């Protein structure tokens, strides 16, 4: 079955979901919110920033964490422009065509599971967190889902299903999505990342606008870059 793989942050959702969720979490709990901006602007690499982010959830019951994700999503979805409209419309087209839809994201299940349920997604490949025997987050990562890890996970999914990569689609907005985009028959760039736009120009990949809007937004159509 043809499969459409979607990155999430700034490809389907207008927000960076991890940051939006953590800001929502800290605001609701009355906690400090300055550490997140300090982390974002630190010289650490992306993986170390992710690990520092997740360690802030150490000691949180996993069930509470997941339930908070549903509350966060409901709040986010009620905003004026929660989605990347072109990405959402593409997902709806794939769903109408009967394609399998898979989210591939460095974010976590607290954010992604409610998105997947709302949008009729078939599967989620994401950062998986360690949970101890008492059902509490340890703050450690079991499996990251950034860069090459996305391509590795997608390769495993396609091998299991027997789907040829050339029958598949992938959508991404960031240079770290390049390994994923490069492995499918129809890669689709979302937004204006300069690395991805360069590849789009060289290889004739389609480019979608990253305009944010409501679920029923009517922004337009595919362009090529």
What are these regions (language model features)?
Residues 47-52, 69-74:
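Glycine-/proline-rich flexible loop or hinge segments
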Residues 60, 64-67:
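Conserved catalytic-core helix/loop/strand module for nucleotide-ribose chemistry
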Residues 25, 49-59:
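Helix-loop "lid/cap" segments that line or gate small-molecule binding pockets
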Residues 1-44:
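Active-site neighborhood of HAD-like aspartate-dependent phosphohydrolases
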